[in-house]
């Protein structure tokens, strides 16, 4: 009798471990075959449409009597005064002739991206 209880306990333990293992893979990989359908629909509902109507409505409602920056919708005096859209990861480099570009910091030290751009403009990089 005791061996049947041990055998039943071992089977229940193996079944629960197998069930937990499959739940891990289902959660990790989005449900695989049939279980991930609901999650896929939920993910698709969060995606932003690829039309420009939302941006266009923000552009139209912005009030600016100077220059409206296209990337950030900031109102500035001159186009090269526009801020970078992602200042945490981008550095603004003014090119000197009234224009500026935003470049990835890429883990460089402060001002290193500007130095590399200047070297490239001179043909040294």
UniProtKB/Swiss-Prot annotation:
Function summary: Probable component of the endoplasmic reticulum-associated degradation (ERAD) pathway.
Annotated protein name in UniProt: Long chronological lifespan protein 2
Spans traversing the lipid bilayer: none
Comp. bias (Polar residues): 40-54
InterPro entries: LCL2
Keywords of this entry: Signal
Signal sequence region: 1-20
Residue runs in coiled coils: none
Chain's gene name: lcl2
Ranges for region Disordered: 35-54
Top-rank taxon: Eukaryota
Disulfide bonds: none
Protein family per UniProt: Belongs to the LCL2 family.
Organism: Aspergillus niger (strain ATCC MYA-4892 / CBS 513.88 / FGSC A1513)
GO terms under biological process: ERAD pathway
């Amino acid at each position: 009798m005791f061996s049947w209880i041990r055998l039943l306990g071992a089977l229940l333990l193996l079944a629960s471990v197998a069930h937990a293992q499959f739940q891990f893979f289902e959660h990790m990989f989005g449900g695989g075959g049939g279980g991930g359908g609901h999650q896929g629909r939920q993910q698709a509902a969060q995606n932003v449409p690829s039309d420009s109507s939302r941006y266009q409505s923000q552009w139209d409602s912005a009030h600016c009597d100077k220059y409206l920056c296209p990337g950030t919708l900031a109102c500035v005096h001159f186009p090269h005064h526009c801020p970078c859209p992602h200042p945490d990861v981008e550095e603004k480099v003014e090119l000197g002739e009234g224009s500026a570009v935003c470049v990835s910091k890429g883990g460089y030290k402060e001002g290193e991206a500007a130095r590399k751009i200047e070297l490239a403009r001179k043909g040294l990089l």
